[in-house]
Amino acid sequence: RRLFETNYWGVVNGSLVAADHLREREGGGAIINVGSILSDAPIPVQGVYSASKHAVKGFTNALRMELMREGATIAVSLVKPGAIDTPYNRHARNLTGQAMQNPQPVYATHVVADTILYCASHPIREITVGGGGRLIASFYSALPGVAEPLFARFAPSLMRDRRSAWQPDEDGLYDPTEDGLDEEVYYPMVRQFSALAEVRKHPGIAAGVVAVLAGVGLATLLLNQRTGPTRLETLRGRFNPREWMDATGLRTHIDD
């Protein structure tokens, strides 16, 4: 209940206050809510958190449609981060009796912040930060009957931090913690860039890159068809390691 008061009702109340303000503002504005990749794909151990983020997604989508019906010039965006380099696991209430972590890939906090700022000036309905999380969510959406047994088997072990037996003396469920941390300090690798988010923010550039790659592939295919197998065999011969050695001399050396 406490988690929902913060994760869900905090978003609801904040969004409604923002909508009232932006209705009266000339030019409207943007409401950007932060969901999670777990808005799309629930996982064990984090069931209540997943449920709260599903609720955030449902409310955000409904709010967008209600504002559309009103004709309000208010864009509503949902940002869905994957695993992020925050002290999330330190500050959450941990009932497992084990040290926990977010599985890789983990992204830096500024990657999410930059995406939120982009949504403030570029209306985007929904955007995911982190390709790994998007892959998991797509897999769950396409094959839930296959995904759920796999998640049940492997997700808890992937979230366990075997490098540390550390357990928090306090958590942030009811009161703020006093460790002063805004980033986790133990992740061996933190990604500073999300290609998936950049593609979503700049679809024209992404389409151009795909077109260039498709053109190169087509040109290669046409060249092969025009030159025929003779040219192809010549290229293979140049890069055939068997032709780079003296087979007779090698056989003699082995016999000796």
Language-model-detected regions and their locations in the chain:
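Hydrophobic alpha-helical topogenic segments used for membrane insertion/localization
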Residues: R200-R226
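Residue(s) in the substrate-gating loop at a strand-loop-helix junction
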Residues: S36
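SDR active-site lid
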Residues: R69-R162
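Active-site helix of classical SDR
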Residues: S15, S52
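Active-site Tyr-X3-Lys motif and surrounding loop/helix of classical short-chain dehydrogenase/reductase
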Residues: R1-E5
